[in-house]
């Protein structure tokens, strides 16, 4: 899985330097973080709706498709912020073996 994420991260980085009319991702970067976040919000809602539909229909194709869009746009957001997908994988790895309640209790309150 990390090979796919690494390849995608490389492409996303390349698109930062591309002309806005050369690709969808380049156009998102050109429009700025707010547009990327707007798109991420849209994809979140679409994923939720697809999951609700899948729960009753037992057809999971749309929820898989929408989840891929959500992950993709999350990676675009991280890239726009100068972060690599490996940071998320590292955080998930850190959480293995840690109770969700313990992890939440260990967080520092934000100021």
Swiss-Prot record:
GO annotation terms (biological process): L-histidine biosynthetic process
Taxonomic path: Bacteria, Pseudomonadati, Pseudomonadota, Gammaproteobacteria, Pseudomonadales
Record flagged with keyword Ion transport: no
Enzyme Commission number, as recorded: 3.6.1.31
Record's keyword terms, sorted: Amino-acid biosynthesis, ATP-binding, Cytoplasm, Histidine biosynthesis, Hydrolase, Nucleotide-binding
Stretches of the chain forming a coiled coil according to its record: none
Reactions accelerated catalytically: 1-(5-phospho-beta-D-ribosyl)-ATP + H2O = 1-(5-phospho-beta-D-ribosyl)-5'-AMP + diphosphate + H(+)
Family statement drawn from the similarity comment of this UniProt entry: Belongs to the PRA-PH family.
Taxonomic superkingdom: Bacteria
Protein name per the record: Phosphoribosyl-ATP pyrophosphatase
Protein's cellular compartments: Cytoplasm
Record-linked SUPFAM superfamilies: all-alpha NTP pyrophosphatases
């Amino acid at each position: 899985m990390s090979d796919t994420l690494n390849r995608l991260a490389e492409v996303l980085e390349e698109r930062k330097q591309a002309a806005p009319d050369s690709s969808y991702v380049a156009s998102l970067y050109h429009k700025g973080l707010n547009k990327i976040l707007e798109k991420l919000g849209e994809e979140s809602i679409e994923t939720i709706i697809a999951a609700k539909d899948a729960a009753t229909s037992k057809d999971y194709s749309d929820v898989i498709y929408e989840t891929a869009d959500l992950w993709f746009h999350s990676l675009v957001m991280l890239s726009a912020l100068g972060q690599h997908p490996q940071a998320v994988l590292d955080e998930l790895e850190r959480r293995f073996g840690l109770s969700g309640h313990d992890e939440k209790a260990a967080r520092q309150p934000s100021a």
